[in-house]
């Protein structure tokens, strides 16, 4: 477990390169994958492993985001920890309870092996999560991915870290539930479920990797599966359901931490920005200081909407911009902090109803 919050980009980076120092660049090794062993070494997954608080993880993200390359790296890390790690933690908790009740020593075997991706000494593995689909309108009931006769078909339109992932946690629709299945990408490893014929594999998995203009080093994936073979052991969680709100709120809170880190250099030039940054930092530290263990949806919703507006307005004033939407003209990464997606707006309305 790491006890320091030294900036990893400055400590391990190579000037002029997005990769760690002494890293042999290879087209087969992506940006996040090249850094993950260092992130493990420096304790960035310690929260998942139960070694530190969620606040300590957030502080690490802020320090990492102080460097331009670090914003992309912090985003990749926080998505894997919050979303893939959140699913894995929830599934492990449920299956350990079942193991205790049923006295079944094999209940958590598959999940235990997945945890090696966050521990030192193992091979580098990356997990991503597929939820968003074309036309789903952020509503789980509108997902069209299904499993029939142990074959999964569907399209996920925006899988963050997907182009580097070894395994994708795929959320589907099944009656009134949203099970999560493991999908192993054949580019990165042998998948025993897949037909060995290359033409069949290419028909079962159709991929399109892409980047966005913000955090451009983060890879995203659109993936279509057509009768992809699924075994019962690939079911990692019986119902994603309400967990989705917790994971999205964690993502948004982590974006608060990225914002705190990203604008540090600007805060050294502008007193108003510095004052608002310190206020936001103090709010985060006090809010999460009250959290013991994993912050669940109810706890996170109690602090939502997270108070980033004053800091964003201070940045606008610093650059003489009309609104936070214009911050992207200074740096595309600022799009991360203007939350207009349907799901976040739904959360805002949910909080308003709770207060009324």
Residue spans for each PLM region:
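Amphipathic, small/basic residue-rich leader segments at the start of a protein or domain
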Residues: 1-78, 273-276, 283, 290-307, ...
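Glycine-rich flavin
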Residues: 20-164, 193-195, 344
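Predominant activation on well-ordered alpha-helical scaffold segments within soluble catalytic domains
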Residues: 58-62, 85, 89, 257-268, ...
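Solvent-exposed alpha-helices and their adjacent loops that cap or buttress functional pockets
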Residues: 121, 138-139, 160-163, 174-175, ...
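A generic structural signal for well-ordered coil/turn residues at beta-strand boundaries
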Residues: 125, 141-143, 164-166, 177, ...
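A short core secondary-structure module
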Residues: 155-204
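Glycine-rich beta->alpha junctions and the first turn(s) of the following alpha-helix
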Residues: 194-196, 206-289
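A glycine-biased, small/acidic residue-tolerant capping/turn segment at secondary-structure junctions
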Residues: 312-333
């Amino acid at each position: 477990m790491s006890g320091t919050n030294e900036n990893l980009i400055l400590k391990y980076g190579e000037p002029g390169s997005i990769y760690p120092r002494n890293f042999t660049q290879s087209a087969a090794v992506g940006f996040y994958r090249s850094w993950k062993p260092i992130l493990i070494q420096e304790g960035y997954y310690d929260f998942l492993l139960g070694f530190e608080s969620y606040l300590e993880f957030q502080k690490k993200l802020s320090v990492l985001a102080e460097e331009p390359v670090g914003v992309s790296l912090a985003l990749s890390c926080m998505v894997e920890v919050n979303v893939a790690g959140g699913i894995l933690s929830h599934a492990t908790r449920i299956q350990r309870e079942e193991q205790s009740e049923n006295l079944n020593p094999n209940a958590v075997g598959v999940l235990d092996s997945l945890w090696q991706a966050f521990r030192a000494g193992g091979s580098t593995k990356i997990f991503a999560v597929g939820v968003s689909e074309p036309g789903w309108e952020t509503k789980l009931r509108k997902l069209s991915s299904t499993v029939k006769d142990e074959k999964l078909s569907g399209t996920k339109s925006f899988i963050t870290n997907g182009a580097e992932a070894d395994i994708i946690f795929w959320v589907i629709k099944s009656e009134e539930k949203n099970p999560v299945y493991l999908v192993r990408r054949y580019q990165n490893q042998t998948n025993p479920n897949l037909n060995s014929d290359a033409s069949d594999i290419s028909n079962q998995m159709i991929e399109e990797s892409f980047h966005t203009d913000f955090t451009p080093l983060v890879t995203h994936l659109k993936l279509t599966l057509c009768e992809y073979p699924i075994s019962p052991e690939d079911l990692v969680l019986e119902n994603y359901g309400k967990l989705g709100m917790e994971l999205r709120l964690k993502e948004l809170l982590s974006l608060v931490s990225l914002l705190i880190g990203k604008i540090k250099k600007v805060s050294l030039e502008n007193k108003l920005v510095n004052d608002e940054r310190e206020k936001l930092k103090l709010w985060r530290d006090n809010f999460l200081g009250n959290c013991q263990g994993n912050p669940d949806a109810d706890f996170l919703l109690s602090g939502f909407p997270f108070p980033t507006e004053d800091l964003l307005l201070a940045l606008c004033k610093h650059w003489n911009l009309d609104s936070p939407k214009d911050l992207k003209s200074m740096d595309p990464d600022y799009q991360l902090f203007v939350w207009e997606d349907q799901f976040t707006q739904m959360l805002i309305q949910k909080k308003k109803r709770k207060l009324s």
